[in-house]
């Protein structure tokens, strides 16, 4: 299993200094370092006990001018916003065992999140803003819907000049961890996260097919013989809490 460093700019040369988040993003970055463990799981109990920093960041997103940001700055801000809004949702409904325990009308379709002076639902941010405006299938490995089956939450905020390295790091990790990827070489079966099923169109647009997108990203699949059968891993909707989740 390859290493994953969710708190450093993986993929950048060691000689290149890491850009530190500034302003409100710095406070969000500090919050993640404090409340997210090495597996990308969240200490919701502690976050619920000390909610002011998260609430301050979430409220501050109302003043963000997305149009003034460069492409990667805009995408980094949107990813941070989606993940922070989701954290806030869980904190407000704590304790819960799963995001699915939250009433449906309060979950992904609730248009309550102020981003740049406009109210969005979580689904609108993901599908109408991020997916519609950015040709970037790797966003499915960074948007965290508070479930164990989601990608891990990084212990740092996303920032514009390290965004590509952060996306690459998340993608590598997902394709090297059995929660999201398993290859049974003997049976010729490739088990993939349901994210590839739900968002197949995004991966097909990028590479022609899900298989063509996956194959270069995992060791040994392309040289293992005929194209394997693809099967979907059951999505784990348990809360991505420190008491749940994959082993480190």
Residue positions per predicted region:
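Interaction/scaffold regions that mediate signaling and macromolecular assembly across diverse proteins
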Residues: 2-248
């Amino acid at each position: 299993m390859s290493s994953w460093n969710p708190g450093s700019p993986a993929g950048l040369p060691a000689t290149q200094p890491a850009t530190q988040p500034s302003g409100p993003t710095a406070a969000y970055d500090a919050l993640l370092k404090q409340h997210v463990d090495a597996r990308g799981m969240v200490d919701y109990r502690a976050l619920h006990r000390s909610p002011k920093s998260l609430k301050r960041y979430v409220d501050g997103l109302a003043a963000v001018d997305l149009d003034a940001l460069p492409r990667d700055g805009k995408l980094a801000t949107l990813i941070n916003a989606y993940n922070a809004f989701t954290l806030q949702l869980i904190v407000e409904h704590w304790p819960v065992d799963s995001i699915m325990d939250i009433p449906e009308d309060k979950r992904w379709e609730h248009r309550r999140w102020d981003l740049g002076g406009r109210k969005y639902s979580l689904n609108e941010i993901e599908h109408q803003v991020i997916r519609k405006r950015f040709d970037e299938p790797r966003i499915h490995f960074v948007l965290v819907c508070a479930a164990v089956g989601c990608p891990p939450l990084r212990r740092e905020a996303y920032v514009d000049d390290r965004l590509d390295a952060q996306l690459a790091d998340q993608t590598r990790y997902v394709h090297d961890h059995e929660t999201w990827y398993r290859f049974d070489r003997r049976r010729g079966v490739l088990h993939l996260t349901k994210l590839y099923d739900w968002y197949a169109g995004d991966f097909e647009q990028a590479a022609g097919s899900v298989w063509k997108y996956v194959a270069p990203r995992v060791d040994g699949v392309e040289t293992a013989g005929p194209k394997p059968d693809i099967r979907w891993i059951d999505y784990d909707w348990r809360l991505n809490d420190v008491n749940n989740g994959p082993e480190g």
